[in-house]
């Protein structure tokens, strides 16, 4: 297996250059579809049936593929996303580049590299005849970087028919996978008061910005009392138009994270209580939002799956580890359904969402070999 993977390293780099050099920001539907078509062509060549769904009002391209009959359980689901955070035109400014150790470019780590790890694993399994014994589903969406609003139900529907889910977000430096992620969401606070001349008759005003200031302190107090299970941070505040006018409107955006499913209810109850506890007479407060991504908590099935990864890695002489992270991924949705889920199947890399994002090219062969070896073991255990 390793010799075959080694022989295709130049092909992998060529594929990586091709995908990275496609602008595919979440609002660039044509770019996302171009990524999908690249993958569809290759998946069809190894016997996968493919379908490009257009989801939501915007028609977000989402690719599904499988090597078995539709409607049946799959042994493994490969999950990833084709969109990036970078705006259209970014590729022209800083296209794919590589030296002996690293590759750079828009989305190279998050997660064009991961898409290609998934593809090349499947091509290795096809070459070794494993796909005859193993059913694999592929779900690559096009809106993960903007919350997966159009594709969440689609992901969950496929995850329910999967025995395991491998998520191809980046692997962390030190070859660390992800077994646990915080859940997340957001809330918006809108305060409405009364404007007045700030110098002549401020007493006639009801200052919406002051109300938001009070609510910000209340949120921080909740954050301090949550005991690490949940966090809420005011990240954006807007209010007022001119310095001599008492503002009649103000708004705050709040980022929320939860460690456990049991942390969700207290967060929701706290934010729902805020409109009844205003501080500035004459100001009303409305709150909207939710915890939109459940936390990813490792269960017994996930830990057993991780043990298989450790075993195969040890046979390769590869040292791997796992971490918990505060960032969310679409793996949260699968894990919340009780499906054993491991994330970080992409290339080892870092600085995601930054202009100096990179992947370590030395991780290409071991990552493909490890995942393919795990899949081969799963196939053998079915016999």
Task: List the predicted regions and their residue ranges.
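Acidic/His- and Gly-rich active-site-bordering loop/insert found
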Residues: 1-106, 127, 131-132, 331
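Metal-dependent amide/peptide-bond hydrolase catalytic core
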Residues: 7, 24, 54, 170-171, ...
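Short glycine-aspartate micro-motif
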Residues: 75-77, 103, 163-167, 188, ...
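Short beta-strand segments
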Residues: 79-80, 139-141, 166-169, 190-192, ...
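Glycine/serine-rich anion-binding loops at beta->alpha junctions
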Residues: 86, 102-116, 197
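Acidic/histidine-rich catalytic neighborhood of metal-dependent amide-processing enzymes
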Residues: 111-182, 379, 383
